[in-house]
């Protein structure tokens, strides 16, 4: 039977038969951090938790590691996805503990504020209104308004980074916030039925202009492809 597996159950069934026939080491090869972080939830929080849980599940199915087929420049707004992957593979903390540890290390005393904002960003992108599960336009515009308020609040937050790590973390978060503001205004215009051709080009121009400074942390091409999915 050369039919390619289509579900997790089918993959696990094949793995079980393979392990019964060949007694050797094994690992997974997966794509968590390829395109989803930009086209799904750019806050990186949901994918970080998914990565963590999947890595923790490897031992359950008899696998000893993971080859992550992913973007190399995946550090904006945070490096949490990679941190969570490593922590799950070699550490003993829960995901919640890992997440708290990361934000404290990256942002110092401002870790709570950074995490709270990104949680609001996650909630916006994973809301029923944004995922097309609700036809209620008023619900969509409420979600947009709430997110706009969250962006304004974090923009006004008095970050006080101490040390190079915290300074870089704040810089990358602020870049994310500015990009999200440009995106949200364009997305609102689209939802209102207005022509967004010029606004979209301005947004993409903003991403391109920042590439020389942020290319070590974000892949501009994939970022724009993710944004196009919403616009």
Stretches found by the model and what they are:
Residues 80-138, 142:
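Active-site or pore-adjacent capping/gating segments
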Residues 22, 59-62, 106, 110, ...:
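Alpha-helix capping/termination and helix-coil
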Residues 1-100, 173, 190-231:
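Catalytic-core regions of glycoside hydrolase
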Residues 101, 111-116, 122, 134-231:
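Mature N-terminal, pre-catalytic/accessory segment of carbohydrate-active enzymes
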Residues 28, 43, 48, 68, ...:
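Generic serine detector
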